């Protein structure tokens, strides 16, 4: 796969301190979605990190592929899958070029990927999702919210920005306030988020 310039995401997994998002368990919002029976069928976790959300879906019977730019994260996700006896697949790949995977999936999950992209790459990312998600398929997307105070963390996203990004060929069914669980940053263990349910038209 052709490499593009990216932030050094692998560095987030090679230091002695876990990255804020690498909490060692699924995000509660995705655990709720799993409990509601929504993480089903052929499922892609775009930006899976060390795999906790993907492995949760696999444990509930989904046919899971997880991708991430960070080789160390993918290696850890594969180790977890093996240790837990789960058949999830994990690949080093670019979320901006998902069509190269040759997949068609029923469900996409995004836990903290959309908010890393600038304006130019947002449209590319949405097109990349459309390349793999079947018509009528669901995307469950969780991103940093403009309701988050302070300056730490990624770019804040407004709900209307999220809706605008998916205005062409998609139906945004809901955008609701939620929270990320995070490793402690400045004394806090949660960050304000939006959880969007988006269906491909």
Name each region found by the language model.
Residues 2-44, 50-103, 117-132, 137-201:
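Class I (Rossmann-like) S-adenosyl-L-methionine-dependent methyltransferase catalytic domain
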Residues 106:
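Conserved acidic residues
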Residues 109:
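A conserved beta-strand element that flanks and buttresses the S-adenosyl-L-methionine
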Residues 112-116:
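Short catalytic micro-motifs in class I SAM-dependent methyltransferases
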């Amino acid at each position: 796969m052709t490499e593009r310039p990216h932030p050094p995401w692998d560095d987030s997994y090679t230091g002695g301190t876990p990255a804020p998002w690498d909490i060692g368990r699924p995000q509660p919002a995705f655990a709720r979605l799993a409990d509601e029976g929504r993480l089903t069928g052929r499922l892609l976790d775009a930006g899976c990190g060390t795999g906790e959300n993907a492995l949760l879906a696999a444990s509930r019977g989904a046919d899971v592929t997880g991708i991430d730019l960070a080789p160390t994260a993918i290696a850890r996700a594969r180790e977890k899958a093996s240790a837990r006896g789960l058949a999830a697949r994990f690949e080093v790949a670019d979320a901006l070029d998902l069509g190269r995977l040759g997949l068609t999936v029923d469900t996409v999950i995004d836990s903290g990927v959309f908010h890393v992209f600038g304006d130019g790459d947002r449209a590319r990312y949405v097109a990349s999702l459309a390349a793999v998600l079947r018509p009528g398929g669901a995307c469950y997307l969780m991103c940093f919210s403009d309701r988050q105070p302070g300056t730490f963390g990624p770019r804040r996203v407004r709900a209307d920005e999220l809706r605008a990004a998916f205005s062409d060929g998609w139906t945004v069914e809901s955008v609701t306030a939620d929270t990320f669980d995070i490793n402690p940053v400045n004394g806090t263990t949660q960050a304000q988020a939006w959880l969007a349910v988006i269906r491909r038209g």
